[in-house]
């Protein structure tokens, strides 16, 4: 009983934390990097 409960608890906690932590930082980092790069290039040209 203890072994089954521990396995289920860890399994349910793993996907929940991974799903909430992986897509957020990955999407945010990619979106921010892409947006920052395009904005900086555009801003640099306009500023200069």
From Swiss-Prot:
Main location: other
One annotated GO biological process: asexual sporulation
Keywords from the UniProt entry: Sporulation
Taxonomic superkingdom: Bacteria
Biased composition (Basic residues): 30-48
Induction: Expressed only in the forespore compartment of sporulating cells.
Ranges of compositional bias, category Basic and acidic residues: 1-19
Region of interest (Disordered), ranges: 1-48
Cell location: Spore core
Family in the record: Belongs to the SspP family.
HAMAP family: SspP
Name listed for the protein in its UniProt record: Small, acid-soluble spore protein P
Gene: sspP
